[in-house]
Amino acid sequence: MRRLKQIIKSFTLWELLKGLSLTLRYFYRKKVTIHYPDEEVPSSFRFRGMLALRRYPNGEERCIACKLCEAVCPACAITIEAGPREADGSRRTTLYDIDAFKCINCGFCEEACPVDAIVLTPEMHYSIKDRGENILTKEKLLMIGDRYEEQIARDRAKDKKYR
């Protein structure tokens, strides 16, 4: 009797029918796939994307060259050199470079900064095409910060309660 059941199951392709029934069940369910280039993936306001340097509202750069971000970076991606400023002699950065190949976007530099000078922007779509573009200089970082300043300020306001 057992052998007969086995023959009938193999003749009717029982396993194939079970698989097809499972496929049909999932075929009519709501799709959860996002077609990436055409549809944007929703991201949190805490998303850690491209790095940027911020300025004060009067246009002065925020970085005071304390080198805490350089010290806390686990990938050693940040290089800072400091010097006195001509106007009042306070310490400012003369060189602020970040190697994008080394950076792991951990956010430690952002947390360590006492004046919120370095931030991670919500920009996730960036590429490096030429040799040497991986070094983000102070000027590039300030330009990125100027471009995203409004959005950074909005995201900081949302997150203020938790900081």
Curated annotation (Swiss-Prot):
Q: Does the keyword Iron apply?
A: yes
User: Which InterPro entries has this protein been placed in?
Assistant: 4Fe4S_Fe-S-bd, 4Fe4S_Fe_S_CS, NADH_quinone_OxRdtase_chainI
Q: Which cofactor does it need?
A: [4Fe-4S] cluster
Which amino acid positions bind [4Fe-4S] cluster 2, per UniProt?
Answer: 73, 103, 106, 109
Tell me the GO BP annotations in alphabetical order. Answer: aerobic respiration
Q: Which reaction does it catalyse?
A: a quinone + NADH + 5 H(+)(in) = a quinol + NAD(+) + 4 H(+)(out)
Gene Ontology CC: plasma membrane; respiratory chain complex I
Binding positions for [4Fe-4S] cluster 1 per the UniProt entry: 63, 66, 69, 113
Q: How does it sit in the membrane?
A: Peripheral membrane protein
Q: Where in the cell is it found?
A: Cell inner membrane
Ranges for domain 4Fe-4S ferredoxin-type? 53-83, 94-123
Q: Which GO terms describe its molecular function?
A: 4 iron, 4 sulfur cluster binding; iron ion binding; NADH:ubiquinone reductase (non-electrogenic) activity; quinone binding
**Cofactor info, note text:** Binds 2 [4Fe-4S] clusters per subunit.
Q: Which UniProt keywords apply?
A: 4Fe-4S, Cell inner membrane, Cell membrane, Iron, Iron-sulfur, Membrane, Metal-binding, NAD, Quinone, Repeat, Translocase, Ubiquinone
Cross-referenced HAMAP family: NDH1_NuoI
- Family in the record: Belongs to the complex I 23 kDa subunit family.
Complex and partners: NDH-1 is composed of 14 different subunits. Subunits NuoA, H, J, K, L, M, N constitute the membrane sector of the complex.
NCBIfam families cross-referenced by the UniProt entry: NuoI, PRK05888.1-4, PRK05888.1-5
What is the protein name given in its UniProt record? NADH-quinone oxidoreductase subunit I
